[in-house]
């Protein structure tokens, strides 16, 4: 019996299902994973903003305008990061006949590492924001310094997230 291409089709579909079942940065799930990463960054940044809103409210009511201004600046930086992440280029749509080259494993590892680093930076920002609230509540330490460190961390995260665009831009042209 001679096999036809239609006979092989179920086997090819099975192999595709196995490969797509891996929920890493595979072709079928790149955009979905990109969306999940961006949602996590936005969620964590929103937590930082919430902590800073609490600091701002308590310090403004208490008459400590210097700390309130620093918290307001941090809230603005959080808003900028949330906006940047929300409007950032989405990861790697790839049409068969487009001018975009396919990502290599090296490209994918670079993107995964970059995404992980951004999430770690935002998590450090959340920890700093929480520490600033704790510092105010216990009257220990310098809350203005901690708020300014939080602002610096979010600002650095914003710049680091912008580098992600360059990683994705490297995939835009075939070489």
Labelled PLM ranges:
Residues 135-175:
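Preference for long, well-ordered alpha-helical segments
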Residues 1-60:
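Leu/Val/Ala/Ile-rich N-terminal alpha-helices, chiefly Sec-type signal peptides and the beginnings
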Residues 13, 30, 38, 43, ...:
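Arginine residue identity/basic-tract feature
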Residues 51-146:
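Charged linear interaction tracts used for macromolecular binding and regulation
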Residues 3, 14, 21-24, 28, ...:
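Residue-identity detector for glycine
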Residues 2, 6-9, 13, 31, ...:
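Low-complexity, intrinsically disordered regions enriched in charged/polar residues
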């Amino acid at each position: 019996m001679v096999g036809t291409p239609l006979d092989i089709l179920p086997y090819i579909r099975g192999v595709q299902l196995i490969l797509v079942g891996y929920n890493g940065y595979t072709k079928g799930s790149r955009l979905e994973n990109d969306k999940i990463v961006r949602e996590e960054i936005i969620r964590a940044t929103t937590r930082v903003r919430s902590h800073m809103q609490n600091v701002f409210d308590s310090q403004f009511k208490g008459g400590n305008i210097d700390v309130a201004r620093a918290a307001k600046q941090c809230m603005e930086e959080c808003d900028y990061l949330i906006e940047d992440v929300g409007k950032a280029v989405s990861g790697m749509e790839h049409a068969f006949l487009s001018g975009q080259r396919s990502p290599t494993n090296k490209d994918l590892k670079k993107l995964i590492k970059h995404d992980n680093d951004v999430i770690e930076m935002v998590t450090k920002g959340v920890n700093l924001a929480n520490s600033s609230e704790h510092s105010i509540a216990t009257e220990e330490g310098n809350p203005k310094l901690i708020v300014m460190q939080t602002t610096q961390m979010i600002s650095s995260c914003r710049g680091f997230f912008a580098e992600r665009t360059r990683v994705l831009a490297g995939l835009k042209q075939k070489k």
